């Protein structure tokens, strides 16, 4: 029984986001996948309810090295972004990869699996987004709590859009968004156990 418990704990914590070597190798493995995700990124950008020329403020939750942030800052040339992540090593890599966008983004280091993480972020944001990140907390109640903390950060008329694995189940996650206060919650795309879903904050 103890062995099983240890195995489950290892599974929950299989990523070593604080290791420079691990983060570097993990990012290299993600590069081919980012090309595959361009379709979902484009759909996400189209779903943001603002004209692309407006100077909107974007929050990327669990931004990692900034793949989604880079894409959105190109799509919204007058936008700025805050990249939230819990790993300094990931933030370092992001700053390297987004050197050409210097001045249009900042990193804020905080752990979204810990209650109160959102207090370190200065909102509101017209668009809050996330890509293949929140599922890493593993615990359904923690995911639910993350959505509750995101809602107050969204500007009235804005949105939260999440491209992630359907784990916890998509139906549950969409219900948690409604519980948090989001309106118009829906799934915009899904396939291969991943989905793009989210909701809006009424004006």
Regions found by a protein language model. Give the residues of each.
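Conserved class I S-adenosyl-L-methionine
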Residues: 2-51
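Core SAM-dependent methyltransferase catalytic element
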Residues: 189-203
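A short glycine-rich, Lys/Arg-flanked "PGG" loop and its adjoining helix->strand segment in the class I
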Residues: 144-156
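A short acidic, Gly/Pro-enriched loop at the edge of an enzyme's catalytic core
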Residues: 118-128
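A short SAM/SAH-binding and catalytic strip from SAM-dependent methyltransferases
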Residues: 126-141
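Class I SAM-dependent methyltransferase SAM/SAH-binding core
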Residues: 59, 65-115
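Short alpha-helix
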Residues: 168-180
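Conserved beta-strand signature within the Rossmann-like core of class I S-adenosyl-L-methionine
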Residues: 157-164
């Amino acid at each position: 029984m103890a062995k099983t418990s240890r195995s489950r704990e290892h599974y929950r914590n299989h990523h070593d986001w604080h290791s420079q070597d691990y983060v570097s190798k993990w990012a290299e493995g993600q590069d081919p996948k980012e090309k595959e995700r361009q379709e979902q990124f484009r759909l996400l950008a189209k779903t943001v309810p603002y004209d692309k020329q407006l100077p909107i403020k974007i929050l990327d939750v669990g931004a990692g090295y900034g793949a989604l942030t880079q894409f959105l800052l190109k799509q919204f040339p007058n936008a700025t972004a805050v990249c939230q992540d819990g790993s300094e090593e990931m933030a370092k890599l992001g700053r390297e990869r987004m050197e050409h966008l210097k001045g249009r983004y900042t990193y804020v280091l905080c752990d979204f699996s810990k209650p109160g993480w959102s207090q370190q972020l200065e909102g509101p944001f017209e668009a809050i987004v996330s890509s293949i990140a929140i599922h890493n907390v593993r615990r359904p109640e923690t995911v639910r709590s993350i959505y509750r903390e995101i809602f107050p950060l969204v500007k009235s008329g804005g949105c939260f859009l999440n491209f992630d694995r359907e784990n916890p189940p998509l139906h549950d996650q969409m219900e948690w968004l409604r519980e948090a206060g989001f309106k118009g919650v829906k799934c915009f795309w899904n396939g291969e156990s991943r989905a793009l879903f989210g909701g809006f904050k009424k004006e």
